[in-house]
Amino acid sequence: MTKYALVGDVGGTNARLALCDIASGEISQAKTYSGLDYPSLEAVIRVYLEEHKVEVKDGCIAIACPITGDWVAMTNHTWAFSIAEMKKNLGFSHLEIINDFTAVSMAIPMLKKEHLIQFGGAEPVEGKPIAVYGAGTGLGVAHLVHVDKRWVSLPGEGGHVDFAPNSEEEAIILEILRAEIGHVSAERVLSGPGLVNLYRAIVKADNRLPENLKPKDITERALADSCTDCRRALSLFCVIMGRFGGNLALNLGTFGGVFIAGGIVPRFLEFFKASGFRAAFEDKGRFKEYVHDIPVYLIVHDYPGLLGSGAHLRQTLGHIL
C-alpha cells in the first residue's frame, strides 16, 4: 500500500499542496489555494486533507520566509504559527517547515534532463557544490552540498547582499536607486519590483519621467520591441542575473552547476537566451577561466518547491536520494 506525505509550497499569495509518495518521491494531486480565502495555513491543510481523503502522518511545507525557530511569521502574509502546535493539531508524527529555496535546492537531485535548459558551460561535476537562485516577488538563494551520502541545503538571505555594479550604466543605476531607497540590495534589481526599478532608473538617468508600469508591462513592451527603455531594462536584468550567478559560482566553487528557479525568466525565455547573461556570468576578470565550464540551468519543472519538500522529508525519514 502506497504511503503518502503532505508537501506544500506557500508564498505570499497562494498555498500549493500535494501528496508525495514516500517511497518514490512522486508528486500527485497538486492543488493551489488562495491564501486570502483562509485564516491560517492549518485551515488550508485541513481543507486539502478533507478533499483528498488520504491518511497522512508526515508533512513538509516550504514557505517564502526565514525559518529560525518554532514560531513562523510569514513575510508577505498575515499567517503566523507554531510548528509544534500545528503538528499536534493535525495529528502528524513528523512536520517540517523549511525555507522555499531550501525546497528548490533539494529538488535539484530529483530533476530529470527534460526539467532543465542549459545555458553554457560543460557537464556538471558529480558531488561538487550547487547553487540555486531565482527572481520572483523577491530574490531567493541557496546552495546545496553532498556530504556523507546526504544532500545538505545551505539556505540564507543571499538576495539581500549589496548590488555590485560592474559597468558605467550599472553604476548610474545604483546612484539613482541609492538616492531613492538607501541600501540597494541585489533583490532591488533582480525581482519583479526590481525590473520596475531598473526601468525607472534608466528613464530618470535621461532626465525623463518614467511611466507607472508593472513588471508585466515592461516585459511585454520589451518583447514587442515597442519601448526602448523597457528593452534596455530587460536586457540589463539579464546581464545582472548573469553577474549575480557568477558571484554565486565563485563563492562556493559550484562545479555541480548553477540553477535558476523562479517565475520571471521563463516568461521571456527566447530573449534571455539571446541576452548578455552568459557573457556576464563569465565576466570575472582573472577568474574568467575558473567559471567558464560551470554549467547554468533554468529549472522548468512545474512544481520544484513541492518536489524538493518531498525530497527533504524523505531524506529526513531515512531515504537516500
Swiss-Prot record:
CDD domains (UniProt xref): ASKHA_NBD_GLK
GO biological process, one term: glycolytic process
Reaction catalysis annotation: D-glucose + ATP = D-glucose 6-phosphate + ADP + H(+)
Matches recorded under InterPro entries: ATPase_NBD, Bacterial_glucokinase, Glucokinase
Gene: glk
Keyword tRNA processing tagged: no
Gene3D superfamilies from the UniProt entry: 3.30.420.40, 3.40.367.20
Keywords: ATP-binding, Cytoplasm, Glycolysis, Kinase, Nucleotide-binding, Transferase
GO cellular component: cytosol
EC number: 2.7.1.2
Keyword ATP-binding: yes
Source organism (scientific name): Shigella flexneri
Source superkingdom: Bacteria
Protein name according to UniProt: Glucokinase
